[in-house]
Design a protein with these regions (language model features):
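Receiver (REC) domain active-site loop signature in two-component systems and cognate sites
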Residues: 55
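Acidic, metal-coordinating helix/loop segments flanking the phosphotransfer/catalytic sites
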Residues: 30-48
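Two-component/phosphorelay signaling modules centered on CheY-like receiver
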Residues: 11-29, 118
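Conserved Asp/Asn-Gly motif in the active-site loop of CheY-like receiver
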Residues: 31-35, 90, 108
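C-terminal output helix
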Residues: 106-115
Length: 121
């Protein structure tokens, strides 16, 4: 079973994403901000991270930059899932090492399609 870390400061978004991904046979961990997510990645080493951009403590972009700079941590597939939909944000995400970018709100078909595209399904 593959594992996914859902990183979002919204409990509702985490709950919806968890339901979808558990339906696709993913084992789920959750974090409310980038700092918690780094800690989870160091311990659990997930196969993928579904990542929000705007969060307290540490943003999704800051998390991704720090994660990609950690050679001793398994490097998961990272899919941004955010309301930030302008090209500048998308470009920054890709440059930092994101594998895919999804706009909120999302549904199960979009999420499944993106996970297929990046080789998780």
């Amino acid at each position: 079973m593959k594992s996914c870390l859902i990183v979002d400061d919204s409990k509702v978004v985490r709950m919806v994403a968890r339901k979808i991904l558990e339906g696709l046979n993913f084992d789920i961990d959750e974090a409310e901000d980038g700092q918690q997510a780094l800690e989870v990645c160091q311990m659990a080493m997930p196969d993928c991270v579904l990542l929000d951009w705007n969060m307290p403590v540490m943003s999704g972009l800051e998390f991704l930059q720090q994660l990609r700079a950690m050679p001793d941590v398994k490097q998961p597939v990272v899919v941004f899932c955010t309301t930030e939909n302008d090209m500048a944000h998308i470009q920054k995400a890709i440059e930092a090492g994101a594998n895919e970018y999804i706009m909120k709100p999302f549904d199960s078909e979009i999420l499944e399609s993106k996970f297929i595209q990046v080789g998780l399904l």
